Amino acid sequence: MAKIVGIDLGTTNSLIAYLEGGRPVIIPNAEGSRLTPSIVAFTKDGQLLVGEPAKRQAIVNAERTIRSIKRHMGTNYKVKIDDKEYTPQEISAMILRKLKRDAEAYLGEKIEKAVITVPAYFSDAQRQATKDAGAIAGLEVVRIINEPTAAALAYGLDKEGHQKILVFDLGGGTFDVSILEIGEGVFEVIATAGNNRLGGDDFDERIVNWLIENFMEEHGINLREDKTALQRLYEAAEKAKIELSSKLQTEINLPFIAMKGNTPLHLSYTLTRAKFEELTYDLVEKTKEPTERALKDAGLSPSQIDKIILVGGATRMPCIQEWIKKHFGKEPQRNVNPDEAVALGAAIQAGVIGGEIRDIVLVDVTPLSLGIETLGGVFTKIIERNTPIPVSKSQIFTTAADYQTSVEIHVLQGERALAKDNISLGRFILDGIPPAPRGVPQIEVTFDIDVNGIVHVSAKDKATGREQRITISNAIRLSEAEIKRMTEEAKRFEEEDRKRREEIETKNQAEHLIYTARKTLKDYGDKVSKDIVQKVEDKIKNLEELIKPERINVEQVRKGMEELTQTLGEIGQFMYQSAGSTAGNPGQGQSTENPGGKTIDGDYKVN
């Protein structure tokens, strides 16, 4: 059976893991790192770069470099490069394809199935978008699993006894907090809460704003208007944030950040940890409300939590750790890698699905309430948040006007009282209802949430017993045709990548052959005829012309290499013929005659 991998598709970094001997293992990427930056870039010459290569060129190619695309999943946001627009699903698929390709090279086998993690507070549209990204990348997404739940699996794989654990997950772009009961192989989520618009990126943004304001005050130049300068600021801000987790202050130096007239300007500021915490105080405060809500929903006090697991690189910030320690009265666990726990947990869930791990039961919950819009724009909940999934619930609805033959049902996710303040999942049109006074028709609408947290809806007219099809009109979701088209485009990118690698390899081989040919002429040019030397030089020039363009013709270059190789062979042939002619001349050296044609034994003496 082919391996099922676990993937943490993160805002800042992504990871892929698999199960080896019953233990989850992170797979390094082609660059040798366990973390792959979630960055995609399109170079001006048409190359697609993903991960570290994309990150390295971001400063000089800021307008064509995309980062933190996860924050736009489930929206109609588009990235425009040249004349083409890309959805968040397509950009995410490029990251997934990089992980898939590197893992296949590492494992030496094809990968077709994956468990992919999402923030616990992801909506239905965001979860569906993640599945679509997997499909575009050529992966069958066998399960969507919540990130805090995955981290709990990684923590609790070998733990004995019953524990109540709280997973505090502050990633690059999202924040989740989940409370679980674990014991005897059962991992049961009892409450979850979060904020999909809060993460490490927001802390970086505060540093960037501070730098821009200081520079504006000092020099009167707004660095936000220069995309290259802005890219440098974001990279410096992220580095400063990381350094302040272990140091009390950090120096931010960016030479030649701008020009004033003909004078280059340099940015140089000292940021202390105290100032950073002042700049980001309200962001830390935003983690408190979801944490309190999760505790309230679970019916627990902070003192009843046995262990606290920190997930996501942003949890390394001292301000976060200090708040947790103060609120819960205990130190968070230090034996879980915040960057890797989610991917490791996804690999464990993949092992459960693949039958490699048998004694684990995972019970997750829906993070948001599910319901419909009713008369007056009110949100009526059908499935409450923190309901264990999978789940199916039905409710009877009726018409609001006399002789109404169709109804529109607006399905939403959220916790607000009014429909307009919640997340719209779609509008369901049910027609063919027999005309009757208002309030008489009975329409049973069933809401299902599957193990991936994705919502499905069906409806039945109780009067006729006839089941009706409901049309979902959600512009954010991709149709099967769109997914197929994007998958084909992704394959074309992969083919283009293959061609590009082939061109580079062929060009390298040609350059090496040219070097060898020139060295051969230098060493033996005076020992062969001028005609042969001229032929070799002509073939070298021809090959040099063929490899001059940015995009070479591989077949022509290979033909040029073959011709040069054959011509070099003439030098070797000429040298051997010359050597043979010299050896066969009896007038040179000792006689080659053997009188009598007999074998002559050699005498030797040992002293």
Curated annotation (Swiss-Prot):
UniProt lists compositionally biased (Polar residues) regions at 577-594
Q: Which residues are reported to carry the modification Phosphothreonine?
A: 174
Q: Which UniProt keywords apply?
A: ATP-binding, Chaperone, Nucleotide-binding, Phosphoprotein, Stress response
Q: Signal sequence: where?
A: none
InterPro entries given in the database record:
ATPase_NBD, Chaperone_DnaK, Heat_shock_70_CS, HSP70_C_sf, HSP70_peptide-bd_sf, Hsp_70_fam
The family database entries (PROSITE patterns) matched by this protein are listed as: HSP70_1, HSP70_2, HSP70_3
An example Gene Ontology biological process? protein refolding
Q: Which Cys-Cys disulfides exist here?
A: none
Q: Which GO terms describe its molecular function?
A: ATP binding; ATP hydrolysis activity; ATP-dependent protein folding chaperone; heat shock protein binding; protein folding chaperone; unfolded protein binding
**Could you tell me which residues belong to the region Disordered?**
577-607
Do you know what upregulates this one? Answer: By stress conditions e.g. heat shock.
The record's listing under SUPFAM superfamilies reads:
Actin-like ATPase domain, Heat shock protein 70kD (HSP70), C-terminal subdomain, Heat shock protein 70kD (HSP70), peptide-binding domain
The similarity annotation says: Belongs to the heat shock protein 70 family.
> Tell me, what does this protein do in biology?
Acts as a chaperone.
Q: What is this protein called?
A: Chaperone protein DnaK
Native organism is Dictyoglomus turgidum (strain DSM 6724 / Z-1310)
Gene that this polypeptide is encoded by: dnaK
